[in-house]
């Protein structure tokens, strides 16, 4: 098994793609990475960073969210079939926000481009619940790291 260097390379970035159009929260040299699972994503993002160290890797995630996991699974069962080449998340907005924050905190990717699989309410939930939850999680993680560093410097 290969070793991969994983570490966040900057602030978390999030975008939403609808068809051939994408909205991203920050400009920059961003490259979208597609993989069916986290292992493949880790490999592809590591290879990208080795080839092009100044770009930011954003993982594409097919998304089906609802207010509860049962409703999200039911909506996914009724959705058209997918090609299976993109990471898939089916669940709640908070769960999706946690996945995005974890992918960034572990240094697997610099963020995500969310691809809504259902239009009925999915885009609204991404805008109204996922994005604010991601901002809160990243803010809490940053504050915790700063608090820990401050405490360590006082004891040194």
Regions flagged by a language model, labelled:
Residues 1-156:
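Active-site-adjacent structural elements that line small-molecule/cofactor binding pockets in enzymes
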């Amino acid at each position: 098994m290969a070793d991969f260097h994983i570490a966040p390379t900057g602030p978390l970035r999030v975008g939403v793609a609808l068809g051939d159009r994408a909205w991203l929260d920050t400009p920059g040299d961003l490259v979208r990475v597609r993989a069916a699972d986290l292992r493949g994503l880790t490999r592809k993002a590591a290879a990208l960073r080795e080839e092009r160290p100044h770009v930011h890797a954003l993982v594409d995630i097919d998304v089906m969210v609802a207010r509860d996991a049962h409703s999200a699974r039911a909506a996914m069962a009724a959705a058209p079939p997918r090609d299976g080449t993109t990471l898939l998340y089916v669940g709640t907005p908070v769960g999706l926000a946690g996945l995005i924050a974890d992918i960034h905190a572990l240094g697997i990717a610099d963020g995500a481009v969310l691809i809504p699989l259902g239009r009925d309410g999915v885009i609204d939930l991404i805008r109204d619940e996922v994005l604010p939850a991601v901002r809160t999680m990243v803010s809490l993680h940053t504050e915790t790291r700063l608090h820990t560093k401050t405490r360590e410097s006082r004891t040194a």
